Amino acid sequence: MLSLRRSIWIAACKRVSSFRTTIPIKSLHTNSQPVLSLRNVKFRPYSTIPLLQSLVPTCNSCGITLQKTDPDRPGFYREPGTGQKLVRKENLVASNAYNGLDDDDLKLLLNSSGEEKDISLFKQRNEPSPKVAPQSIQCIRCREAQFRSEYSQDEFPIESLDAIMTSLPPDAKLVYVISAADFPMSLDSRVFSYRSALEILFVITKCDLLFPTLNLANKYGLPFFQDYFYRKHGVSGENVVLTSGKIDWNIPTLLKNGKIRDNSYLIGSVNSGKSTLLKSMLSVSNKLAAKKQHLSSRERVKLEKEQDRLINSGASTPSDIRALRRKNEQEKNRTGPGASYMPGYTRGTIPYDVDGITMHDVPGFGENVDSNEFASLFSYLQPSQMKQLSKGVPIHKYGTYKSPFETIKGGQCYTVGGIFYMVPPPGTMVQARNCINHKAHIFSNVDKAKASLEAVANEDENGAHAGLRNVFIMPGSALKKLVPRYIPAFYGAIDLVVAGAGHVNLTPTGAPTPTDEPWIVWVPQGVRIWVRQPITRYITRTLAGRDAKGNPLRKELWKQKSVTHVERYTGKTPFYTRLSANPDNTMATKDNRYPAWYE
């Protein structure tokens, strides 16, 4: 019986194999309808949808439709050529010398061990081979930005929120990417007029700037962000995820738990980390798929050697960690969309296949883009300065109560690169902890600060004020656009937040005294600056002001005897507010810390 079944099975296999070999492949494509199935593709790593690319070629870096007729129009590109592969001069000389030898002399030269070698293979290896054309095509703008760091502000337009949201299909699954570096400035509530907050997945990126480890991010950071979105927008905690596209925090969890659904669109403000997040998901998806495949003997030996080296060296040395991160960054640069610190880098919607799920990278939107007076912080800066600010600084190192600080006296002017000029009222003392990636400076008054920037802008590099050149990153033209803004009354510490750059923690010291003078912040027109409650109050352990028995302590004894705790966000007081155009005479107290704040 078994032999009969086996013979029937063998005969069936032969018929199937003969059927496959007799029908030409061309007839299969012509007689059957083509089917685009993403889930049935066997390990197609980080590729855009090939059918769409063949019909309408787009830049794989920014997503714009390509054209090769007009160099002055957006999307211009040059077709890749198939030239000869470049060969080192030394290798070329050696190749010519080997080719000049006859077979007997070449055997005598190469066959010193007595083994027979294939001479044709050796000659073929030394001959230049044709260069393989790249699979992806980039526009000239992206290539200049990637390989030459050449940028033009006109080629990086920023779309409005209305233009982005109206271009999305009605059945799109939205993933709202929000930066943790300037939270909640990158969260625009106008999105909820197009889609309910309950239908959106919120992904908080750049969390490595807030926490030193992933465990602390999940332990302290996740409860705060879940509380915030639930109190403000009624969002369930399951729809809030903390990530870091730079070091792949929570990316495997995001992919495995089914939080990312098919036909998802990554939306968010400019420089919120959408493209970096997508590159991270593509890279992690590739690694997860590679683990499922069988390793070759060479790959297995290489992996075992790396594991042995890490085990013998402690596996946690800073050099090993840096080397691993550099390797991951190099792999990410070869995958997915282009990511840049330049706002407006992505210009079109780009579809990607992430483990059988279609995801779309969407251009970032700005605020008040349709206004005739639209400007932002990055419109004042050079590309190198944008890169510096966008990197950010670790808040867990520079923004806590243990971090070093500078003391500002009332009437003095505190500035970070000329982005803003903050003047506290007379009679106050302020501790400032800078969490912006540029050195702060304190001037005697605001007039001295303005005069210094004007002098630096009008002099050459060796002028009398050359020592102040590194103090400012804003150009001298920003002085004409400075407008005074006022911080609403507050009690205790606050964060002065700059959109796209970071924040400065301000902690007044001493007994609060009534004053008629407001807190003034001079801001260039278009630069968005808010104030918020200290975010470290809700994501790190801070001083509670009580001893171990629960007794309240005097302020000067806090650091010596106070216990630490993490506050939970309740939403009873405003978390942030915008700067006011008029001074505020409201008096803040311990029981009413933010009397004039509004969200």
Curated annotation (Swiss-Prot):
Residues 312-342 are annotated as: Disordered. PROSITE patterns: G_CP. One of its GO terms (cellular component) is mitochondrion. Keywords: Mitochondrion, Transit peptide. Residues 158-368 form the CP-type G domain. InterPro entries: G_CP_dom (IPR030378), Mito_lipid_metab_GTPase (IPR050896), P-loop_NTPase (IPR027417). SUPFAM superfamilies: P-loop containing nucleoside triphosphate hydrolases. It is found in: Mitochondrion. It comes from the Eukaryota. Residues 1-46 form a transit peptide. Residues 322-334 have a biased composition (Basic and acidic residues). GO terms for molecular function: GTP binding. May be involved in the mitochondrial lipid metabolism. Belongs to the TRAFAC class YlqF/YawG GTPase family. GEP3 subfamily. This is Genetic interactor of prohibitins 3, mitochondrial. The lineage of its organism: Eukaryota, Fungi, Dikarya, Ascomycota, Saccharomycotina.
